Structure formats: C-alpha cells, structure tokens
Amino acid sequence: MVCYLYWETFPSISHLLKITLSARDCHVCGLNLFIFMDPVENQALHPVIMALILMPSLHCFGNILILLFLKSPAQLFCRMSVDLALLFPHK
C-alpha cells in the first residue's frame, strides 16, 4: 500500500504527525508513506520532519516513512533508488 501525499496539503506539522501516526496504526505491513516537499520553501521544517522519520514508533508493523524532497511525482523514479539507498543502506 502506497500513499502519495503533497506537503502543500498539510496545514500544520501537527496535522502531518496525526496522518503519519494514523498510517502507523493501519496495521498494514509494508505501508509506505511518501511525502513530497519543496526543499527550499520548507527548509525550516526539515529538522522536524527528520525527527519524525527517526521515531521508532513509526516503524511498527513494518511501516516505513520515506522522505523524498520532490515537487512532483514525475521526479519520483529518478530519485527513489538514491533516497532508498541513503535511508536503508545494505548491511
């Protein structure tokens, strides 16, 4: 199950957290939550977003929160392999 979400659709960071925790509670193994952000316009929020991705509770039930600093889904395929490699390096 994959949820494509645009940062512009979130009115606040608390709304983002609520949606993220709701996704965690879905009990769907392998749920992926992709958040598309503009890295320049939302630069001040990066520390908060990075804190979210490091929360152990977000990884319950096999759920994964993946950050992709993109403006449109069209950029997804050229960046996905790079981002996944950085977030989940092979041991």
UniProtKB/Swiss-Prot annotation:
Keywords: Membrane, Transmembrane, Transmembrane helix
Subcellular location: Membrane
One Gene Ontology term, aspect cellular component: membrane
The keyword Transmembrane helix belongs to this UniProt entry's keyword annotation: yes
Membrane-crossing segments per the record: 49-69
Main location, first listed in the record: membrane
UniProt membrane topology term: Single-pass membrane protein
Name of the molecule in the record: Putative transmembrane protein encoded by LINC00862
